[in-house]
Amino acid sequence: MATDTADANGRAARGLARLSGILRAEAANGLFWGAGPDEEARLRRLRELAAALLAQVDHRPYETILAAYEADTGLRSPMPGTELRIDCADGTRLVRRRRLSRTSGTLGQRLETVAAALRTRVPTEPVAIADTDLAGLPCPHTFLLVYELQTHLDAPAAAALLEPTEPDLEGDVPSLNPSASAVVPDHGVLQVAPVVKQLLDAIAALAKESLAETADPYERERQHRIAALCEAAEETDLEYPRIDCGDLTADCVSTGADAAVFDEAGRLLLIRRTDTGQWAVPGGAAEVGEPVGLAAVREAFEETGLDVELTGLSWAFDKRDTKLGDDRMPMIMSFTARALDPAQPLRLAELEASDARWITREEAEGLDLFRGHGLRVPAAFARHRGER
């Protein structure tokens, strides 16, 4: 019985860390996009309350947690990283997990550096995607692109050339084939202590106040999400253990996801963006608490009305490896997909898309494509046709 109680309390602590991370991101993203004075004050208060939630379970004091949260200046999304699986000459497999950051080099640079050190080929594409949120780790939400390498070095020699795994990425983190990565997290009902319920009630009151005062559709969506999170928690008597919730100051390389949806004739669905009038693959920012594959599926539905399933990963697209450096959202996970029902009609989101078109590869060459999509659209066609 004592073991069962301890396990339940541990799950509740990790769940609270996850919730705090989601609310941290909602506050940071709302502040990034800008708001009026009253809404900005509410978002800053949300940030404070999110830090107070984490202080119920993390070993660090509230002031330290809040300082980390207040340092957020960019968009917060699941953080990209790599899981390198290196098969050595002596039969040992080494595994190294590290996040990407804005200062430690691009995805392409990391792969090239590691391959050169191990005297092996640069891996061309990830074999799987791992996700710390799906694994139940309490660290900031991170997805890991899994690459496999082989080296003629033995394990001690190879290990000496590699940076160690970041401590908060240690543990059992299952990986999924990219085509199967649109997993809906099932963490169950979050059990919370009475003091946490009080904090969530305060957050829900902020959301209610925002909904009464703001007409901005994106901010209203945000506040509805926040209110739903607060409502889903269930108060109970429990005692939280103190846990390590990972590197709260880890640099977030903001990540988006898109879905290149193909029909049975091999045509690609593009939308005309309402803001620029250019053509693009449906996509947008990934949200903390959702796998990047699920973000691609969600964005396709929100912008086109189509229910889709992933068929693969076209490109883990680090814009910093191109001339399209983008401080706002440097990383894009570009998936291929198909509609679950080929007869399902399109239903465009007017705020996002003014038109949509199924196009061939040849037709795509004559379109005015949104920045970055001039690279991603040909890559999607090549992936769909099995050319890469």
Region annotations inferred by a language model:
Residues 37-83, 217-258:
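Acidic, metal-coordinating catalytic segment for phosphate/diphosphate chemistry
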Residues 77-81, 87, 142-144, 252-256, ...:
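Short connector loops at helix/strand junctions that flank enzyme active sites
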